Amino acid sequence: MSNIYKAFENKKAFIPFVTGGDPDLETTKNLLIAMEKAGADLIEIGIPFSDPIAEGPVIQEASQRALAAGCTTDKLFDMVKEARQRVKIPMVFMTYINPVYTYGKERFMKRCVECGIDGIIVPDLPYEEKEELSGVCESYGIDL
């Protein structure tokens, strides 16, 4: 049974969202810790992307601020790894398919495991590509 499944077991889950790197990575790390202390069951971390088509203006602007502040996928992985030393609840990345493919699917999942990410949400994943990405996620124990 995955950690994400356990977060929902016999209850509703409180799942706050934060855009990684907005306003900066240190603040994001502190927010992750505070979210768990405030009672979060699972945390969703948005990976900043230059074209977040599935997002409204608030998250689009947060992504732009994070990118302007120098947030990269590698830096976000490193920050989550640091936060994971204190945050024990499941954490998932909300990302787009382009960053996953650009980074490399296998490499991306390996980094997710190394930093303690439990799953990913990919809102623009084409149905035709779901099985392929699902297989890679499954091989690394990452929920999709």
Predicted regions and their residues:
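N-terminal amphipathic alpha-helix/helix-capping segment at the start of soluble metabolic enzymes
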Residues: 1-17, 81-85
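Short beta-strand/loop segments at the ligand-binding rim of alpha/beta enzyme cores
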Residues: 10-15, 86-96, 137-144
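Active-site mouth loops of central-metabolism enzymes
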Residues: 14-28, 92-104
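Conserved beta-strand positions in the central sheet of alpha/beta enzyme cores
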Residues: 15, 41-44, 121
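Conserved, mostly hydrophobic/aromatic
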Residues: 16, 35, 46, 112
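Glycine-rich, proline-tolerant flexible connector loops at the mouths of alpha/beta enzymes
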Residues: 23, 40-72, 99, 127-130
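Glycine/small-residue-rich loop that forms an oxyanion/phosphate-binding "nest" at active or ligand-binding sites
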Residues: 60-115
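Catalytic beta/alpha-barrel core
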Residues: 68-71, 116-129, 141-144
